[in-house]
Each structure stands twice: as structure tokens, then as C-alpha cells.
Amino acid sequence: MAGPELSVPATKTYTTQLGAMAVLAVALSGGGIGVAELQLVPAAVAEMLEVAPAAEALADRLVAVETLVVSGRGYAYSTALELSLKLKETCYLPAVGLSYADLVHGPIAVVDAGTPALLVAAGDGPMVPEMTGLARRLAATGAPVYGIGGDQEFAAACRAALPGPSLPEHLAPFALIVPGQLLTEALASAKGLDPDAPRGLDKVTQTGA
């Protein structure tokens, strides 16, 4: 349904994995989760493609960055990990993906004026205020804080933020990754790199017995 995965950094694969998990959840819920909700996803993903110009502007801010901390919580945690992986693969940026809890437990000490943070949050749900508080806490250290998703207060707490989807929190990951993918593509291009063919990567990795 998604077509061949041509790019070495597998973006379609990630989204279709989310889809497979969602379909499984619908099947196991015995009617508790409706298919109608999933039908909201395609339009939300398409809407996120319009974020490309803003993603290019944010990429310009990050082009000279040497390291980056990416963090999310709840349903957005997987998005943060996937985004940090794509930044490493395609932009050769040593991005560290951490959950909110792991970050504030100790590694938060490395975030300063020379180490930006990229925070990812759904547009609603109980995690948004906590991510907003984290953005403010990091900004108080002088760290450049950038965001993806969240609400207006979250965006205001960040130096710059890319909008996220208007989806319930449990569906947000489908479209929340798209601004991150656009940012990754723009940052790789700004560095003169080919985001579809990173060095040292093959389509299939054999790890041996």
C-alpha cells in the first residue's frame, strides 16, 4: 500500500509499522478502538507536508550544530527516538534520543548553550504541560530549545517550533514524525548530503549468526 521503500533511511517502514500496531490494537480491543479514528490519519499526514518551508528555516539554525538532544514522552517518545536515528543516519549529527524521564534524571546536565534540545510533543494529552515545563527549564540554562508539535504554550516556550498534527494523542505519532522527516531532509541538504543514500549504509544489513 505504501509502495517500495527506496530510501535507505527507512521512513515508510516506520509509518507502516505504526499502522500495523494500530490495526492490531483495533483487533485486540474488541471494539474499544474504532477504525473511524484511523481514517483521520491520512489527511493529517498530508497536512504536515505543508510544514516543509518552516522545516527548512529550522534546518538553517541547526546546520552548524555538532550534537543535539531529542526528547519526548508518552506516545511521542517513539517519535523522538526515530527522529534522533534519522538525524544520525542522514545528517551525520550525533543526536541523542532520550525519554523525558531519562533526560531529567541526569543527562540534562549536558544540555547548555552549546547543546540544543529538540523536544517532541503531541498536541494534547497529559504530557504536553510536562514537555512545556521541560522546554522552559532547558531554556533557562541558555540552551537553544526547539520543538515539534505541542500546543501554543509549548511553542512559546521554544526558540522555534514546527507545528504538529491535530490528532488525538494516541494517533499523533503517525503524523508527528513528518515534520521531523522534513527537518532531517532539509538539514541533510543544507549540509550538502544526500538524505536518501547515507554513507556506510546498505538497504539490508547482515549481522551474522
Predicted region positions:
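A SIS-like phosphosugar-recognition module
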Residues: M1-A209
